[in-house]
Each structure stands twice: as C-alpha cells, then as structure tokens.
C-alpha cells in the first residue's frame, strides 16, 4: 500500500513539477517531503506529516529547512546494543 501511495507523488515530481516554476518555500520541497515521510513512516503517519507540511506552505510562513522527523527507534533495539 505504501508503494502505491508513492506513485502519484513520483508522477507529480517527474511529469508536472518540471513544467511549473519552483514555488516551494521549504527545503526539501513539499513533494520530496511527502515522498520521504510516507516511505519512512508509512502511509498513515507519513500521510499525516505530509498534510501538516502542506498546511504550513503558505505566503505567511517564512519556510526554510524542514526535514522529515526521524523514525523513532524502539526501546528493545537500543537496549540490545
């Protein structure tokens, strides 16, 4: 399901986005952020992070560097080391 959700984002990034001028006020761009968020966090959490990011993408937000949050590590894997 995750990979299927990434297809429209890839289509936008490679077919539509090059035809438009760069307008994203964030780095990475909103489409790159959405792709990375869904790929790293899954469809539900990554989708929610993407929606929140798109909600911040407006003229009154200064933008800037806004990376995808790191995937939380489980306590059991950190205790095993």
UniProtKB/Swiss-Prot annotation:
The keyword Iron-sulfur appears for this protein: no
Keyword Membrane: yes
Assigned keywords, A-Z: Cell inner membrane, Cell membrane, Membrane
CC terms in the record's Gene Ontology section: plasma membrane
Topology within the bilayer: Peripheral membrane protein
Subcellular location: Cell inner membrane
Major localization listed first in the record, in broad terms: membrane
Pfam families in the record: YidD (PF01809)
InterPro entries per UniProt: Membr_insert_effic_factor_YidD
Role description: Could be involved in insertion of integral membrane proteins into the membrane.
Family statement: Belongs to the UPF0161 family.
Protein name (Swiss-Prot/TrEMBL): Putative membrane protein insertion efficiency factor
Organism: Pseudomonas syringae pv. tomato (strain ATCC BAA-871 / DC3000)
């Amino acid at each position: 399901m995750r990979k299927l959700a990434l297809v429209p984002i890839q289509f936008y990034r490679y077919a539509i986005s090059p035809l438009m001028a760069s307008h994203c006020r964030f780095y990475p761009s909103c489409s790159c952020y959405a792709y990375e968020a869904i790929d790293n966090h899954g469809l539900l959490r990554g989708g929610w992070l993407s929606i929140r990011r798109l909600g911040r993408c407006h003229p009154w937000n200064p933008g800037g560097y806004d990376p995808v949050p790191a995937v939380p590590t489980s306590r059991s894997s950190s205790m095993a080391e």
